[in-house]
């Protein structure tokens, strides 16, 4: 149970692929102009990570070490192609919005990195959990950044949610404030860099506060041989 908890905590927070490893910055900065786009790409990446880790782990005993990287890339490309066709079939509006960034998941360092660092050494179910945790950590970072940029840029949240979740999701759209001229800095890549920098700073402050709290609450060590002395 402790290993499962450690995998989840590492993926979601301590070793977050976007906020700690800073991997996959190209889609993170390019696609997160709205919360819907960010959530869509994040969930697609999570699905690819989970299925890829599961497949790589299941085949690890029959994968020659000399050609493992090309095999990993072939597995990732196959999974990404399947996910791309699913999005094209069931969420065509989102498919058009994400464009080239769906097939570019193949080249995402997160996917190859987890296949090499974790899935090639662990069992299938732990590997699938690792992929899911890493993917959800990246999805969370994308969603927060996309929400921040959409609110500051357009004054809305979940605009175009129907392209991801269906026509019923139109009711999810919220207008935080009305604006006739969008705040372009928030919508363009420079705004994504600024938003990501703010998120990194907030995570650092939270981590430092947690370290100080643990240091205060930790019991003081008793030197060996001192117990029982008057």
UniProtKB/Swiss-Prot annotation:
Record-stated family: Belongs to the NqrDE/RnfAE family.
| Transmembrane portions of the chain | 18-38, 39-59, 63-83, 86-106, 125-145, 182-202
Q: Which InterPro entries match?
A: NqrDE/RnfAE, RnfE
**What keywords are assigned to this protein?**
Cell inner membrane, Cell membrane, Electron transport, Membrane, Translocase, Transmembrane, Transmembrane helix, Transport
Q: What is this protein called?
A: Ion-translocating oxidoreductase complex subunit E
Q: Which HAMAP family match?
A: RsxE_RnfE
**First-level EC class:** translocase
An example Gene Ontology cellular component term from the record?
Answer: plasma membrane
Pfam families attached here? Answer: Rnf-Nqr
Q: Where does the record place it? A: Cell inner membrane
Subunit text: The complex is composed of six subunits: RsxA, RsxB, RsxC, RsxD, RsxE and RsxG.
Q: How does it sit in the membrane?
A: Multi-pass membrane protein
Gene for this chain: rsxE
Q: Name one GO biological process term.
A: electron transport chain
Query: What's the stated role of this polypeptide?
Result: Part of a membrane-bound complex that couples electron transfer with translocation of ions across the membrane. Required to maintain the reduced state of SoxR.
The UniProt record lists the EC number as: 7.-.-.-
């Amino acid at each position: 149970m402790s290993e499962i908890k450690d995998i989840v905590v590492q993926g979601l927070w301590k070793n977050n692929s976007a906020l700690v490893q800073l991997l996959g910055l190209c889609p993170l900065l390019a696609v997160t102009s709205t919360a819907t786009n960010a959530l869509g790409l994040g969930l697609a990446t999570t699905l690819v990570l989970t299925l890829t880790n599961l497949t790589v782990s299941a085949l690890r005993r029959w994968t020659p070490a000399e050609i493992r990287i090309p095999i990993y890339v072939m597995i990732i490309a196959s999974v990404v192609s399947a996910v791309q066709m699913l999005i094209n079939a069931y969420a065509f509006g989102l498919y058009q919005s994400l464009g080239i960034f769906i097939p570019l998941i193949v080249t995402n360092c997160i996917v190859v990195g987890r296949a090499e660092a974790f899935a090639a050494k662990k069992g299938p179910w732990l590997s699938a959990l690792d992929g899911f945790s890493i993917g959800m950590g990246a999805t969370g970072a994308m969603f927060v950044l996309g929400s921040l940029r959409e609110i500051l840029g357009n004054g809305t949240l979940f605009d175009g949610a129907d392209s991801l979740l269906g026509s019923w999701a139109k009711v999810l759209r919220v207008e935080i404030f009305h604006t006739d001229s969008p705040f372009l800095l928030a919508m363009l890549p420079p705004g994504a860099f600024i938003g990501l920098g703010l998120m990194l700073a907030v995570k650092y402050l939270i981590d430092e506060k947690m370290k100080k709290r643990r240091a205060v609450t930790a019991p003081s060590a008793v030197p060996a041989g001192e117990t029982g002395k008057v």
